[in-house]
UniProtKB/Swiss-Prot annotation:
Biological-process GO terms, alphabetical: glycine decarboxylation via glycine cleavage system
A cellular-component GO term for this protein: glycine cleavage complex
InterPro entries tied to this protein: GcvP, GDC-P_C, GDC-P_N, GDC_P, PyrdxlP-dep_Trfase, PyrdxlP-dep_Trfase_major, PyrdxlP-dep_Trfase_small
Lineage of the organism: Bacteria, Bacillati, Actinomycetota, Actinomycetes, Mycobacteriales
Role according to the record: The glycine cleavage system catalyzes the degradation of glycine. The P protein binds the alpha-amino group of glycine through its pyridoxal phosphate cofactor; CO(2) is released and the remaining methylamine moiety is then transferred to the lipoamide cofactor of the H protein.
One GO molecular-function entry: glycine binding
Presence of keyword Ribosomal protein: no
Keywords on record: Oxidoreductase, Pyridoxal phosphate
Protein name: Glycine dehydrogenase (decarboxylating)
Matching SUPFAM superfamilies: PLP-dependent transferases (SSF53383)
Length: 941
């Protein structure tokens, strides 16, 4: 175990004495003995003579927090923070310090998980409902989701949504030529495997001939032009096509919104609402539709329902659309969204209100008008919002260089055109410097009135009551207090790896040298960032045993998708494009099947044994049956059942022998680092979750980073980008070349500070804690799956099905009751219905792990009282959970259990009390009565 003065000792919860105590309960004498019993010998890495795991010897020795931050400061100072007037979907913004301090830098917000337990997630859900209301108001559409990964993927989702919703049979999509290049490229990526034909044209002239299921255009366009798309919308509808507009939300405070001109879908980004550019991300994309398309929306959708006392409460609505339920029939493969950034954007809108946003928009437009007035006839478009396109015949490079000399980056369109984008941070001095670069004198602006919007927006009190810093600070605290995040309790969610997100790892993400970089800035501005990215890629290669890594995918789902596209393109390059069968075990996460479907593959399910392992005979039969068309096997390792399958090498060999590729889902990599490398035991490609194994916080449901790691033969097919020729020539999956680059310093810092020994110790400790929980709880809740030697990996599944059958107490009852004990529930009913999957991670102390076990054992005692008939099935502390303070102080208490049993089942000194803000929520009511925007204040009376 690491010395107590190291960062690793701060990150890893149990000290050596605690680890020894847990190992004693497990029945092994050392961590190495535990690894030998749990991890199959055939794949387990052997330590070198000096005790270092293979691959990890390529990592630098561990640095202290001070040393790592000093190195990061050096990388940051190598960058140049120029004034960005590049635009193209990314704009500088002024983040209110009250939001920076109370959201982005606040662990109560950034360490939470996706709000699957809504009763203890009401703060986040309210903030996300504000986000949905903000987007719906500004776009003029009824329903928005919360949220998308970025603008480009939102456009791709808009395309597939329109195809699902279209009544016609056409497979053609019309895309306007003035759509952002990165957006058009991502749409093309998504269209290709789905058999969608894209027709790119200047749609100001109307739709081209032929049938289309959908149309995509931009408002304003990439050139800055504001086009009235009403005629195009009408024409498209007459011909049976739906229309999606990529709309700038700040511009929509002034111009007519998409919904008012009849558009069916609006998509875009909320980045300029207080979220730094961050060299490309993370930012919250958005997608809004008319109400009749609500069930076609991808991703998370927050709705209003009622709790057990009839009070309004929030929850995730219409979850049957999503990948974790519908698998390959889901509306999307998206799992992680961008919750933390959506909260930032929503609170930015709340802080400024409609009047403030409109004033910002007018100021931005005013600066653009000043530039246009000076340029005169060189301006290409008459109507624009923030971006001025100028003709400079043969002088583009000269103008760009002159601006650069003045500390400003402009956008070179071609030899003869330069684009200038203004934003919230633009000043009069910036405008003057731009005019000098063009060699023109200031002129009196001529008003180009673009304010055609008449509809009100952001009228709900959520956007009018919090204009002072005091009010906003208290609002954010009130919301945070309604949730359970890692700052209050362990979150033992299986398959989610809710480990520590250390303050030292988080600190650099707000440094301007990282945060204020445009993703298309000149490479000369970002050498430090590029070196950081190179370091992280090399370290991940060393850890995983692969040969190349792309950091572009901004979620695990996108990493999966990128990996499957690389496999498809590899087969095609060898003259085998017909290989389209993807084998997936029945136990797999739903994202696997959804990603395979999006990649144009046909999913064939492989059976599993009763012990959770892949049925090797069934696999071989399926491989033989589909040998000529076999593309891929997707398999999670360790398995989704929380064990190390001993047949993994044979499984990989069977697929390779048939010409297929093996996709090892890296969701559970926290159980492998320093112990085994997927790139060495049979994997051809994996996605990794930096927001699990490598400490990027979950943010309440995003951001995430899902790098894709490959063997050398797949490296040429990794994601490329239209504005990054240095990348491979594969197809882009994210709007920015390096995805959510501004949070990569978190994982860089984690690896740099842990070092080889610390990383291996983290995996071993995670396995130890999981096996300790399995031993302590097996007597009360049988552990469903173990490996050959009776061991689990880094998580264990508790089987409640016999308990439910005998007593009527459900897994839902236990999950809700845990909130009364102060804990977030483990993962419910995945991968097996009626079970709980527990993953403690290495960061939790033995004291916290024991408290969780004590709570579970006490709950089993309550279940036994129900089973014995002491409490009715329909009226007991479990079925009544969670209990609010309000329900306990009512005059009438007609339950067979006491108020003290309800609120303090293990006494008042057990742990700090968490008061759930609402009772159990009626999910079915919320889906039947869909409300996805802020409810009126009267609803809470």
């Amino acid at each position: 175990m690491p010395d107590h003065t190291t960062f690793a000792a701060r990150h890893i919860g149990p000290d050596p004495q605690a680890v020894a105590a847990m190992l004693d309960v497990i029945g092994v004498g050392s961590l190495d003995e535990l690894a030998a019993k749990a991890v199959p010998a055939g794949i387990r890495d052997r330590l070198s003579a000096d005790g270092i795991a293979p691959g990890l010897d390529r990592l630098p020795p561990p640095a202290s927090e001070t040393e790592a931050l000093a190195e990061l400061r050096g990388l940051a100072e190598a960058n140049t923070v120029a004034v960005s007037m590049i635009g193209q979907g990314y704009y500088d913004t002024l983040t209110p310090p009250v939001l920076l301090r109370n959201i982005l830098e606040n662990p109560a917000w950034y360490t939470a998980y996706t709000p699957y337990q809504p009763e203890i997630s009401q703060g986040r859900l309210e903030a996300l409902l504000n986000f949905q209301t903000m987007v719906a108001d500004l776009t003029g559409l009824e329903i928005a989701n919360a949220s998308m990964l970025d603008e480009g993927t939102a456009a791709a989702e808009a395309m597939t949504l329109m195809r699902r919703a279209s009544r016609g049979k056409s497979n053609r999509l019309a895309v306007d030529a003035d759509v952002f290049a990165q957006t058009a490229a991502i749409v093309a990526t998504r269209a290709r495997p789905l058999g969608i034909e894209i027709v790119t044209a200047d749609l100001r002239d109307g739709l081209p001939d032929g049938d289309f299921f959908g149309v995509i255009a931009q408002l304003p366009g990439a050139s800055g032009a504001i086009t009235d798309w009403a005629a195009l919308v009408a024409q498209a509808h007459e011909r049976g096509a739906l229309v999606a507009l990529g709309a700038d939300l700040l511009a929509l405070t002034l111009i007519t919104p998409p919904g008012e001109i009849g558009a069916d879908v609006a998509f875009g980004t909320t980045q300029r609402f207080g979220v730094p550019m961050g060299f490309g991300g993370p930012h919250a994309g958005y997608l809004a539709v008319h109400a009749n398309h609500a069930r076609q929306l991808p991703g998370r959708l927050v709705g209003v329902s009622l709790d057990a006392d009839g009070s309004p409460a929030y929850r995730l609505a219409l979850q049957t659309r999503e990948q974790h339920i519908r698998r390959d029939k889901a509306t999307s493969n998206i799992c992680t969204a961008q919750v933390l950034l959506a909260v930032m954007a929503a609170m930015y809108a709340s802080y400024h209100g409609a009047e403030g946003l409109t004033a910002i928009a007018r100021r931005v437009h005013g600066h653009a008008e000043a530039i246009a007035a000076a340029l005169g006839t060189a301006v290409v478009h008459d109507r624009y919002f923030d971006t001025v396109l100028a003709r400079v015949p043969g002088r583009a490079d000269e103008v760009i260089a002159a601006a650069k000399a003045r500390g400003i980056n402009l956008w070179r369109v071609d030899d003869d055109h330069v684009s200038v984008a203004c934003d919230e941070a633009t000043t009069d001095e910036h405008v003057a410097a731009v005019l000098e670069a063009f060699g023109v004198a200031p002129a009196e602006p001529v008003a180009s009135e673009i304010a055609t919007r008449t509809a009100e927006f952001l009228t709900h009190p959520a956007f009018t009551q919090y204009r002072t810093e005091t009010a906003m600070m208290r609002y954010l605290r009130t919301l945070a207090d309604k949730d359970i995040a890692l700052d209050r309790s362990m979150i033992p969610l299986g398959s989610c790896t809710m480990k520590l997100n250390a303050a030292a790892e988080m600190e650099p993400i707000t440094w301007p040298e990282f945060a204020r970089q445009h993703p298309f800035a000149p490479a000369s501005d970002t050498p430090g960032l590029r070196r950081l990215i190179g370091d992280l890629e090399n370290w991940l290669v060393a850890i995983t045993g692969y040969d190349a890594v792309s950091l572009q995918p901004n979620a695990g789902s996108q990493g999966e998708y990128a990996g499957l596209l690389a496999i498809h393109d590899y087969h095609a390059s060898r003259g085998e494009p017909h290989r389209d069968i993807c084998l997936i075990p029945s136990s797999a996460h739903g994202t696997n099947a959804a990603s395979a479907a999006l990649a144009g593959m046909r999913v064939v399910v492989v059976g599993c044994h009763d012990n959770g392992d892949v049925d090797l005979d069934d696999l071989r039969a399926k491989v033989t049956e589909h040998r000529d068309r076999l593309s891929t096997l997707m398999i999670t390792y360790p398995s989704t059942h929380g064990v190390y399958e001993h047949d993994i090498a044979e499984i990989c060999a069977a697929v390779h022998d048939a010409g297929g590729q093996v996709y090892v889902d890296g969701a559970n990599l926290n159980a492998l680092v320093g112990l085994a490398r997927p790139g060495k035991f049979g994997g051809d490609v994996s996605h990794l979750n930096l927001h699990k194994t490598f400490c990027i916080p979950h943010g309440g449901g995003g951001p995430g980073v899902g790098p894709v790691a490959v063997r050398s033969h797949l490296a040429p097919f990794l994601p490329g980008h239209p504005h990054a020729p240095e990348l491979p020539q594969g197809h882009p999956v994210s709007s920015a070349p390096y995805g959510s680059a501004s949070i990569l310093p978190i994982s860089w810092a984690y690896i740099r500070m842990m070092g080889a020994d610390g990383l291996r110790a983290a995996s071993l400790t995670a396995i130890t804690s999981a096996n300790y929980i399995a031993r302590r709880l097996d007597e009360y809740f049988p552990v469903l799956y173990t490996g050959e030697n009776g061991m689990v990996a880094h998580e264990c599944i508790l089987d409640l099905r016999p308990i439910t059958k005998a007593t009527g107490v459900t897994v839902d009852d236990v999950a809700k009751r845990l909130a009364d004990y102060g804990f977030h529930a483990p993962t419910m009913s995945f991968p097996v219905a009626g079970t709980l999957m527990v993953e403690p991670t290495e960061s939790e102390t033995l004291t916290e792990v024991d408290a969780f076990c004590d709570a579970m054992i006490a709950i089993r005692g309550e279940i036994d009282r129900v089973g014995a008939g002491e409490w009715p099935v329909e009226d007991n502390p479990l079925r009544g959970a969670p209990h609010t303070a309000e329900c306990l102080v009512t005059t009438d208490w007609d339950h067979p259990y006491s108020r003290e049993q309800a609120a303090y089942p293990l006494g008042k000194d057990f742990r700090p009390k968490v008061w759930p803000p609402v009772r159990r929520i009626d999910g079915a009511y919320g889906d039947r009565n869909l409300v996805c925007s802020c409810p009126p204040v009267e609803a809470f009376a």
